[in-house]
C-alpha cells in the first residue's frame, strides 16, 4: 500500500513534466520568440520568451550551478517522498509538484540550454515575470508545503496544549 501511495507522487511529477514539455514544445514550434497572443486582454497573454537564468532572469548563463542545484534538490525530494507516511498526502502532493517542476525546467536546460517561458500575466497593471508550467508547479508545491507544515504545527501545538491542560 505504501509503495502505491508513493508512486502516485511520482505519477503527479510525470504528468507535470508531460504538460510542461508539451506546452513548451507548442510555444517553440508555433510562436516566434517575443510573439505575444492575448488570452484575456490586459490580464493574461501567451508570450514566447526564453530564460537562461533562474526566476526573474537572475544568474543568467550559470548552467553548471543550475545543474548542481537541481540534482541536489531532486535527490532530496526523492528521499523525502520515499520516507513519506500515508498520512502525509498533502506533503506528498507538494513534493510531486516540486519534483515535476524541477525536472521540467532541468530538461529545458539540458536540451535547449535555456528555459522556455510563455505565461505572461498582468496583476493590477504590474507585468509579472513570464513563467511556465514547471514554474507554476514548483510555486504551488512550495505553497502546499508551507500549508502542510503550518497545519501540522498547529495540530502538534493543539495536541501538546491538550495534554498539558488540567481538569478539575
Curated annotation (Swiss-Prot):
GO cellular component, one term: plasma membrane
Protein's name according to its UniProt entry: Lipoprotein signal peptidase
Residues at the catalytic site: 117, 135
Pathway: Protein modification; lipoprotein biosynthesis (signal peptide cleavage)
Biological role: This protein specifically catalyzes the removal of signal peptides from prolipoproteins.
Lineage: Bacteria, Bacillati, Bacillota, Bacilli, Bacillales
Organism: Anoxybacillus flavithermus (strain DSM 21510 / WK1)
A single GO BP: proteolysis
Swiss-Prot/TrEMBL catalytic activity: Release of signal peptides from bacterial membrane prolipoproteins. Hydrolyzes -Xaa-Yaa-Zaa-|-(S,diacylglyceryl)Cys-, in which Xaa is hydrophobic (preferably Leu), and Yaa (Ala or Ser) and Zaa (Gly or Ala) have small, neutral side chains
Broad enzyme group: hydrolase
Protein's UniProt keywords contain Transmembrane helix: yes
UniProt KW keywords: Aspartyl protease, Cell membrane, Hydrolase, Membrane, Protease, Transmembrane, Transmembrane helix
Compartments where found: Cell membrane
Domain of life: Bacteria
InterPro entries per record: Peptidase_A8
Primary location: membrane
The enzyme's E.C. designation: 3.4.23.36
Molecular-function GO terms, alphabetical: aspartic-type endopeptidase activity
Membrane topology: Multi-pass membrane protein
PROSITE patterns xref list: SPASE_II
TM annotation in the entry: 8-28, 61-81, 91-111, 128-148
Record bears the keyword DNA damage: no
Family note: Belongs to the peptidase A8 family.
Amino acid at each position: 500500500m505504501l509503495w502505491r501511495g508513493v508512486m502516485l507522487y511520482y505519477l503527479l511529477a510525470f504528468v507535470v513534466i508531460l504538460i510542461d514539455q508539451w506546452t513548451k514544445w507548442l510555444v517553440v514550434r508555433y510562436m516566434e520568440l517575443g510573439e505575444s497572443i492575448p488570452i484575456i486582454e490586459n490580464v493574461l497573454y501567451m508570450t514566447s520568451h526564453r530564460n537562461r537564468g533562474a526566476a526573474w532572469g537572475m544568474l543568467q548563463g550559470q548552467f553548471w550551478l543550475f545543474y548542481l542545484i537541481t540534482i541536489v534538490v531532486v535527490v532530496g525530494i526523492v528521499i523525502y517522498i520515499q520516507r513519506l507516511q500515508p498520512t502525509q498526502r498533502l506533503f506528498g502532493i507538494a513534493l510531486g509538484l516540486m519534483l515535476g517542476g524541477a525536472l521540467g525546467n532541468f530538461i529545458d536546460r539540458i536540451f535547449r540550454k535555456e528555459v522556455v517561458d510563455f505565461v505572461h500575466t498582468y496583476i493590477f497593471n504590474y507585468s509579472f515575470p513570464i513563467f511556465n508550467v514547471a514554474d507554476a508547479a514548483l510555486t504551488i508545491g512550495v505553497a502546499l508545503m508551507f500549508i502542510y507544515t503550518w497545519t501540522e504545527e498547529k495540530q502538534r501545538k493543539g495536541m501538546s496544549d491538550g495534554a498539558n491542560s488540567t481538569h478539575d
